[in-house]
């Protein structure tokens, strides 16, 4: 090494190269520092060269005494890791009066860097103020106090090398030098914090005499060898580096430290050694951290980065690869930074970890997202593979929850196995759980709804059959039977649903409004059935009017009270209409609101009146036909028996002639046999009526146009009798018919009556205006409000 600070007080530009070439940069903290100060031309460079094998420039005696070392020079010991600083001598002629300022700066620099400060002085100068460099010593003491103020440093070792020593009693020289040092210390104004301190609290003074190099060469060489051992032989009790010094900085940061230190000293700023050390530590730690991060980024680029056009895939060895790379990066940083301030090293290490974490975290999140996507994919596959219906004894929810738990454990394990040490990353896997939970709840709701719909659909089949049977009968218990059926089927549906839900899902039960579903469905069935209300009324009328109670077709005779039968049959048909007038599905425990469908009007008043009119027009034909049959029978019964006998006798020849023909004879036997059998069974009247109906139907088909015209006329006019009624005066009968017509010309029950209160009753006539039962008259066109029939 050569000059590091010029005589003008400027740092050389190639300081880094010089420190590196000396080998100190690679020494870490395993090196020592020694600085030497003293008067100009006192042999400072010479003694360093002799002690450490360096090649500092020395004075050329042929040119006389002059300034040889300008500024500060540095060199490494040839055989030992000791960095030497050769400081420009004081009291030089060249500097003159400006010497004091540079002397102070160089002394402060030497004390700040060196573990041992060597003061080279002549024995002959001891005891003289200027000659013994008392001002220089005073400067050393003052700047050392300044260092102590800035840091709690170790004592400064000051080695006085007494040149050209001739004293027999060296102790006397030491005493005299100590006296001078004490006097200097007493003149120094100590800070308040150091009041009462002795100079021994700040300095460790050592003394070593060296004989004259020319006159006493052998002794001089022996003295140099002895002094060298103080620097390079640790076992020696006088070894100067026995104690660990706080002044040594890591070799790789020494150049930066020197640069910062001299900048502060040269600008006369307050020197803060700990601050400078911290600055150096931060600088080097930043430098090492940047290099470690660069190496790590290279690893990421080579192993983790993927082509943007390629799909992201799971990296199987993600954690081992990253663990190893992170470990290498941190190891590189620690190996190159551990010599600096521990606090700074740890602080920057934490920052480096965060920087590495910031680089790795996106890759970690990407891997975790793939795990989550794979988990959801497996979950969806499982949901699709299981039965899509709930069954008795099934365990749908527990099976799904078990799968979710298993997938969640796998996901957490994958995330944990992907987390790189020493980072504590957390991936929000709860989002996956939320998605699976929502999907499960949605699927559960769908299956429960599907189950209810399936069970209700199955129940509806039998319900429709039973409900239609009830609606077809249209009796007084129709609404009671419908309510009982609804109650029964809704209870069964609820029980069946809960039986399936009990083992499949928890906390879910059948809907409370299942009964309402059946009620609503029943209303639709009733409305559908009400579309055929006229047909139902006609069928009910026919069952009563045209058939006996035992189900046989009615054969009308003069003994039948046709008017009463007609009235009863007509009332039965009208009762069907009343049953369908309004809905009666509400029960006592049902919550019925205003305008509730369970109590709604099914057939409005105006519509009911129209239906009744149509019903009246339809059933009148059956009444007229029955009257015609009775009249025909009456006419037949008026022919006397002798007339039939006379007719038979007059026709006997013709009859015998017919019977002589085998064909007619066979027909007569067959017809006679059939008639005898029917008579024995009591079915002759039924057979007669059937034949007459067939005959009449045939006639109607043959005279279709005429019948249609007659039908239109009958709808607009009252039917007239074609034959006089037997056993009654024709004139009296017409007067009675006129009276009956006037009495029953009122509107029908649904035209004249109003719905009252709950609509439970309507009025119909209670007595027949017809007189004698044996005198059949035309049926009443309408009913008077004299009879009350309760609604069911």
UniProtKB/Swiss-Prot annotation:
Its EC number is 3.6.5.-. It is a multi-pass membrane protein. GO terms for cellular component: endoplasmic reticulum; endoplasmic reticulum membrane. HAMAP family: Sey1. GTP binds at residues 38-45. It is found in: Endoplasmic reticulum membrane. Probable GTP-binding protein that may be involved in cell development. Residues 691-718 form a coiled coil. SUPFAM superfamilies: P-loop containing nucleoside triphosphate hydrolases. Residues 703-792 are annotated as: Disordered. Residues 1-638, 684-792 are cytoplasmic. Residues 660-662 are lumenal. GO terms for biological process: endoplasmic reticulum membrane fusion. Residues 707-723 have a biased composition (Acidic residues). Belongs to the TRAFAC class dynamin-like GTPase superfamily. GB1/RHD3 GTPase family. RHD3 subfamily. InterPro entries: G_GB1_RHD3_dom, P-loop_NTPase, RHD3/Sey1, Sey1/RHD3-like_3HB. PANTHER family: PROTEIN SEY1 (PTHR45923:SF2). Disulfide bonds: none annotated. Its main location: endoplasmic reticulum. This is Protein SEY1 homolog 2. Residues 28-245 form the GB1/RHD3-type G domain. Residues 739-751, 764-774 have a biased composition (Polar residues). It comes from the Eukaryota.
């Amino acid at each position: 090494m050569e000059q590091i600070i010029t005589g003008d007080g400027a740092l050389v530009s190639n300081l880094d190269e010089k420190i590196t070439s000396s080998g100190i940069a690679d020494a870490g903290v395993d090196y020592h520092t020694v600085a030497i100060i003293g008067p100009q031309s006192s042999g400072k460079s010479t003694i360093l060269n002799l002690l450490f094998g360096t090649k500092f420039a020395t004075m050329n005696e042929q040119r006389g005494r002059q300034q040889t070392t300008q500024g500060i020079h540095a060199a490494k010991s040839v055989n030992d890791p000791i960095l030497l600083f050769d400081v420009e001598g004081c009291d030089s002629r060249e500097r003159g009066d400006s010497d004091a300022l540079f002397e102070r700066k160089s002394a402060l620099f030497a004390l700040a860097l060196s573990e041992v400060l060597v003061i080279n002085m002549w024995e002959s100068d001891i005891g003289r103020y200027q000659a013994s460099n008392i001002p220089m010593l005073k400067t050393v003491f003052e700047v050392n106090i300044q260092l102590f103020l800035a840091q709690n440093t170790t004592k400064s070792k000051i080695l006085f090398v007494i040149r050209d020593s001739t004293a027999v009693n060296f102790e006397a020289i030491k005493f005299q030098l100590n006296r001078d040092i004490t006097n200097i210390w007493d003149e120094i104004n100590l800070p308040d914090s150091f009041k009462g301190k002795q100079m021994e609290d700040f300095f460790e003074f050592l003394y070593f005499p060296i004989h004259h190099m020319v006159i006493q060469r052998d002794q001089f060489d022996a003295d140099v060898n002895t002094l060298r051992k103080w620097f390079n032989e640790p076992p020696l009790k006088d070894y100067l580096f026995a104690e660990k010094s706080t002044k040594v900085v890591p070799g790789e940061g020494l150049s930066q430290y020197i640069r910062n230190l001299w900048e502060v000293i040269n600008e006369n700023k307050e020197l803060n050694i700990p601050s400078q050390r911290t600055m150096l530590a931060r600088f080097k730690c930043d430098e090492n951290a940047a290099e470690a991060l660069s190496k790590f980024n290279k690893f990421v680029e080579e192993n983790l980065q993927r082509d943007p056009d390629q799909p992201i895939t799971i990296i199987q060895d993600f954690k081992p690869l990253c663990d190893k790379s992170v470990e290498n990066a941190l190891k590189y940083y620690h190996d190159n930074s551990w010599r600096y301030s521990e606090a700074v090293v740890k602080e920057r290490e934490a920052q480096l970890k965060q920087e590495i974490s910031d680089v790795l975290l996106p890759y970690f999140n990407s891997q975790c997202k793939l795990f989550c996507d794979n988990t959801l994919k497996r979950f969806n596959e499982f949901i699709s593979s299981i039965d899509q219906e709930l069954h008795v004894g099934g365990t749908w929810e527990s099976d799904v929850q078990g799968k979710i738990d298993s997938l969640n454990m796998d996901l957490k394990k994958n995330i944990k196995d992907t987390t790189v040490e020493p980072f504590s990353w957390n991936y929000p896997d709860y989002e996956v759980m939320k998605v699976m939970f929502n999907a499960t709840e949605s699927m559960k709701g769908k299956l429960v709804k599907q189950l209810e719909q399936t069970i209700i659909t199955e129940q509806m089949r039998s319900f429709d059959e039973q409900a239609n049977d009830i609606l077809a009968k249209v009796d007084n218990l129709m609404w009671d039977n419908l309510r009982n059926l609804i109650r029964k089927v809704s209870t069964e549906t609820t029980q069946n649903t809960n039986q399936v839900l009990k083992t499949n899902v928890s906390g879910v039960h059948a809907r409370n409004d299942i009964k309402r579903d059946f009620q609503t469905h029943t209303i639709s069935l009733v409305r559908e059935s009400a579309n055929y209300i006229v047909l139902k009324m006609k069928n009910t009328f026919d069952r009563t009017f045209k058939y006996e109670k035992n189900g046989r077709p009615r054969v009308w005779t003069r003994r039948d009270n046709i008017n009463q039968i007609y009235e009863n049959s007509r009332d039965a048909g009208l009762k069907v209409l009343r049953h369908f007038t309004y809905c009666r599905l509400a029960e006592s425990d049902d919550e019925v609101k205003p305008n509730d469908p369970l109590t709604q009007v099914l057939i409005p008043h105006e519509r009911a009146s129209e239906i009744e009119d149509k019903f009246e027009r339809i059933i009148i034909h059956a009444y007229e036909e029955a009257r015609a049959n009775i009249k025909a029978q009456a006419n037949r019964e008026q022919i006397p028996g002798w007339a039939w006998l006379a007719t038979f006798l007059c026709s006997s020849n013709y009859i015998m002639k017919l019977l002589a023909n085998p064909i007619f004879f066979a027909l007569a036997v067959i017809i006679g046999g059939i008639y005898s059998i029917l008579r024995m069974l009591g079915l002759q009247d039924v057979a007669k009526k059937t034949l007459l109906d067939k005959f009449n139907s045939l006639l109607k088909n043959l005279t279709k146009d005429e019948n249609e015209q007659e039908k239109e006329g009958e709808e607009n006019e009252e039917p007239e009798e074609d034959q006089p009624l037997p056993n009654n005066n024709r004139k009296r009968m017409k007067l009675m018919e006129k009276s009956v017509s006037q009495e029953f010309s009122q509107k029908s029950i649904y035209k004249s009556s109003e719905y009252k209160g709950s609509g439970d009753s309507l009025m119909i006539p209670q007595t027949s205006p017809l007189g004698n039962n044996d005198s059949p008259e035309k049926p009443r066109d309408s009913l008077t409000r004299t009879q009350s029939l309760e609604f069911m």
